[in-house]
Amino acid sequence: MGISVDNIVKKIQSTDQKYNYDEIFFDWIKSMFYAYANTCNTEGYEDREKEFNRLIEKHGAKTMQMFYECHAELVILFEEKGIDDYLGKIHHQLGVHNKMKGQFFTPFHLAKMMAETQVDGVIKKLEEGKIKITDQACGSGCLLLGLLAVLKEKGINYQKNVLIVCSDLDENAIQMAYIQLTLAGVAAKCENKNALTEEIFGSWFTLGTLLF
């Protein structure tokens, strides 16, 4: 079977039924998040290491191997099929979207359509120099990814000219956004934040900030 969202979903569904799909999915997210965040964020490094080791103890070698395989497939999807909200799609296909919190993940084709209406203005600003793009309720990063995809299609090198500052109150959502913005190669600061009170619970830079 080729590399695809469906393949990742099936791998997650094939795990032992000791835990629900939502718990398995978000533990996979955490395993990737801890690994990426620890490459370029010193604050909280040891805590993330401890949490990663806790995941190993919780799930064991078989499930952790599945996590590694799914992670590798996600990387390949970004490299070979381009930018997309892959984690949002996997999240939806597993049926673990959180209706109780009123969460809604925008379909990626709509995110790109919205980006198309704004991209000319973004490109004009880029002609003047580096720019910052903000999203205070970013979810899995779908709208931001849509804009990056459109910029890339138009031949714009956003990696050295665009800084994203995004946040979400939901810790799982911002971790999804952080992973995908990392894989998209963009400079980003991602915050677990209450946009109303301005309280910040965590803040992390992506690897792309090293090039910005």
Walk through the language-model features, giving the residues of each.
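Class I S-adenosyl-L-methionine
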Residues: 2-155
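Conserved S-adenosyl-L-methionine
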Residues: 108-208
